[in-house]
Amino acid sequence: MNQIFLGQRAYGFAAAAEIYFGKPIKELTIAEAAMLAGLPQAPSAYNPIANPQRATRRQQYIIQRMYENGFITEEQAEAAHRQPLRYRPQSDSGTHAEYVAETVRQLVHSQYGDETTTRGLDVHVTVDSSDQLVAYRALRRGLLNYERRQVYRGPEDYVDLPADPADLDARIAEALADHPDNDELKAAVVLEASPRKVVAALQSGESITVTGDGLKPVTSGLSEKAGPKTQIRRGAIVRAVKGPKGDWILTQQPEVEGAFVSIDPRTGAIRALVGGFDFGKNKFNHVTQAWRQPGSSFKPFIYSSALEKGFTAQTTVNDAPLFFDAGATGSQPWEPKNYDGKFEGPMLLKQALAKSKNMVSIRVLQAVGTQYAQEWATRFGFDADKHPPYLTMALGAGSVTPLQMASAYSVFANGGHRVNPMLITRITDNQGRLLRDVQPPEVDESMRVIDARNAFVMTQLLGEVTRAGTAAAVHQTFRRADLYGKTGTTNDSMDAWFAGYQPHLAAVVWIADYTPRKLIDPDPGSGLRLPAGRE
């Protein structure tokens, strides 16, 4: 009984008594004990902190059963029914830094091994809690907004609901125990459904009614033509999220994944890190572990190499069709295209980057030389072997991680210096003894990897991207002149990027679809990743 999970990270009734009520188990009142007694059946569904209504109904039922079975008197039962419960204040767990915590655990374990869990280590990190929460919310909001525009795939499951209202609540709680809430994305059991209205029960015990625009994402599931596996009917387990006006919207768990990371370009200190949509569902950290094609977000590094070779922002390059036969490519013939399929002829370098013109990028790389551009990219922290010296490098056909991209864009942000990302600043043991103390290094000339003039011109070029180019939504939102960045979409439209910076922060948002479908239309200005990047 002292090993059973009872919610709120409590294992066993002794721990639950302390966590929920802040007292030893022997000091619990009948009402408090009844509340804990209801937890084993469904710790999440009957958690009084998260689901007070459902938990209270369960508690009241248990008190009544205790009286009926002679464990307490009528007077004790009446008093227990009336007693208001006061819970111990819960620690704030709203930062949502699960990926940060796991990354820290891995870093510490690599240094201290098995002692990581036995020495009571206290680890201080560079992450800012407010930045972390904003990043978490923004990424999830962007992915959920995208998912609402996709074809509805159907309910997560179906459950047979009893006709007797007395048994209904327990059946709902049992069903939702296998489909826990995902933060703001709530699991719900449908009680009644029609094309105009859906009534469903949440894990908290609350009943919600969804109508109008809240049904649009699941319209196909409410159609008479819906198949048995996609139809929303009584007993269907669906997902609901609150809209900006507080109204409920039916949706589904995203199939797309994403990541966000921001660092201080002056020091390399990581300020926020979100490795995916849901750590509980997928612990793979896409910020540090996902090697993906950067697409057009890699073009600035090709342009930077061109500046070193004598190009300027006013250099004219022809945006005209290109064709490479098998002899030139060493494999298959290649006829690259611009995203919009249009060619605009001779244009300035700054216009070409703002419009993300593929033909110009390829011609620039031809002039610079693929070997030189590959070596130049390593100055920003990229791995040469992941960026083969071919012309496809101009379109971002290599492999990067979001953390690499944030670090690389920091070079432009800080005037040409390379900083190494850092997460841990201080470690002490359970006796308070200092084991590690790392202060962010001051940027100096020993860290310079590109000329300050190169970084300055690149910042001006990337400012044109956010002012009037593929990332113009950034300027339209903030009306600030100190925001610079570049969008990126891979040729197969499976990955979408936005990398941007201002003098004190560099950030990267990446979104991708692992399913065999295009993530977005082949438009480098797509609105999918920009909302998360703007926030």
Regions found by a protein language model. Name each.
Residues 1, 78-81, 316-322, 378, ...:
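Beta-strand segments within the central parallel beta-sheet cores of soluble alpha/beta enzyme folds
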Residues 1-201, 364-367, 378-379, 383-384, ...:
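Non-catalytic, structured segments within soluble enzyme domains
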Residues 2, 6-9, 26, 30-42, ...:
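Glycine-rich, acidic and aromatic/proline-enriched surface loops and short helix-turn segments
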Residues 26, 93-96, 266, 311-373, ...:
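Conserved catalytic neighborhood of penicillin-recognizing serine enzymes
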Residues 47, 285-289, 332-341, 390-393, ...:
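Short beta-alpha connecting loops at secondary-structure transitions
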Residues 66, 135, 195, 267-268, ...:
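Active-site SXXK
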Residues 125, 129-132, 136-138, 167-171, ...:
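A penicillin-recognizing enzyme superfamily signal
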Residues 331-336, 369-407, 423:
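Mid-domain, small-residue-enriched loop/turn segments at the edges of structured enzyme/sensor domains
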